[in-house]
């Protein structure tokens, strides 16, 4: 019995001595395979990747297997990619691969494939990115009874903008808000996108829907009645409301476009219908709200002429503030929703590239 106690004491002393000499190398991840530990490990080299609409991106994912656990490798490896919803309660199938059998789903058909850089590479390539591709993706690798996962976030370069229709503020339920963004070449923004916009200076005093069904608004300069006086800046959260009955504005998100946005040089000012026809005559279409915001934010477009847009609003983009042209800040200035038949303005057009 004394011998056993002595052996235990010696073991503890040895462990303490060596733990004092151990340093953690933060640049490397060392995986130790325990006897009953995981035999399959899945990792993403990057937690987040960035791209833009129309571009291509690779979602990184690699797997590491214990060859002694799988014998001669008779188990086929199954790779599955899914997209996570904002509440993580539902997954949308994207791509599945097992040997020579591969399948893509929904809007990803013809746009996704495995990178295949090495035998253990499960990275997914997505081409011709759309606004809807933004979000978090899960890479799952299955071999026999073993499986493991990794999550990668896909972020898009773009701009968040507040939106309300001709009817006025606080007139959209959640479903109408989604459609309103789509009509303006955009999608309803996520909380992360709104938060990033707030950090970049977005200040807006009207609450709007976000993609997760919450209602929030960003305040950089707290004041009455916008966030309250003597309070800290931040994204104010109204919480979750009835998607069918509750009515608010909406925050939309858009990204780079494949085309030309421009102010049409025309000898006279135009009614709304004349503006629509003038763009058509020029081989283009009347521009949408998302396109004027994308041109302003991503291309630095600047024009001190108010012009019609597709939704019947009149706006103008200023990236270089100056006297009589948004002197206080760079912004897309909103004139309003004038009478379409009697008010005369210029027009902004958009010509898509084939």
UniProtKB/Swiss-Prot annotation:
GO biological process: cell adhesion; central nervous system development; skeletal system development
Name the UniProt record assigns to this protein: Hyaluronan and proteoglycan link protein 1
Keyword Disulfide bond: yes
SUPFAM superfamilies, alphabetized: C-type lectin-like, Immunoglobulin
Ranges of residues in domain Ig-like V-type: 38-152
Domain of life: Eukaryota
Glycosylation sites: 21, 56
Disulphide linkage map: 61-139, 181-252, 205-226, 279-349, 304-325
PANTHER family (UniProt xref): AGGRECAN/VERSICAN PROTEOGLYCAN, HYALURONAN AND PROTEOGLYCAN LINK PROTEIN 1
Domain Link: start-end pairs: 159-254, 259-351
């Amino acid at each position: 019995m004394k011998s056993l106690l002595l052996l235990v004491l010696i073991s503890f002393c040895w462990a303490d001595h060596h733990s004092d000499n151990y340093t953690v190398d933060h640049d490397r991840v060392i995986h130790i395979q325990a006897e009953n530990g995981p035999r399959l490990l899945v990792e993403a080299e990057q937690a987040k990747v960035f791209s833009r609409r129309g571009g291509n991106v690779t979602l990184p994912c690699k797997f590491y297997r214990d060859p002694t656990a799988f014998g001669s490798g008779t188990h086929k490896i199954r790779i599955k990619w899914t997209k996570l919803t904002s509440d993580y309660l539902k997954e949308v199938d994207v791509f599945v691969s097992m040997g020579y059998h591969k399948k893509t789903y929904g809007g990803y058909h013809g746009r996704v494939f495995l990178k295949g850089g090495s035998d253990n590479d499960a990275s997914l390539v997505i081409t011709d990115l759309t606004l809807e591709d933004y979000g978090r993706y899960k890479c799952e690798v299955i071999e026999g009874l073993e499986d493991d996962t990794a999550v990668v976030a896909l972020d898009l370069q773009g701009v968040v903008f507040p939106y309300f229709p001709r009817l006025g503020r606080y007139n959209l339920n959640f479903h109408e808000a989604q459609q309103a963004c789509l009509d303006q070449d955009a999608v309803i923004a996520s909380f992360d996108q709104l938060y990033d916009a707030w950090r970049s200076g977005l200040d807006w005093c009207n609450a709007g829907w976000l993609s997760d069904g919450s209602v929030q608004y960003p305040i950089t300069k707290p004041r009455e009645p916008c966030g309250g006086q003597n309070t800290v800046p931040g994204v104010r959260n109204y919480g979750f409301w009835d998607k069918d009955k509750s009515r608010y504005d909406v925050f939309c998100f858009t990204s780079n476009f494949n085309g030309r946005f421009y102010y049409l040089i025309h000898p006279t000012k135009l009614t709304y219908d004349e503006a629509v026809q003038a763009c058509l005559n020029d081989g283009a279409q009347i521009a949408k709200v998302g396109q004027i915001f994308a041109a302003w934010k991503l291309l630095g477009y600047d024009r001190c002429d108010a012009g019609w847009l597709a939704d019947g609003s009149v706006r103008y983009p200023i990236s270089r503030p100056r006297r009589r042209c948004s002197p206080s800040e760079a912004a897309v200035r909103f004139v309003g929703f004038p009478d379409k038949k009697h008010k005369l303005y210029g027009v902004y057009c958009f010509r898509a590239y084939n």
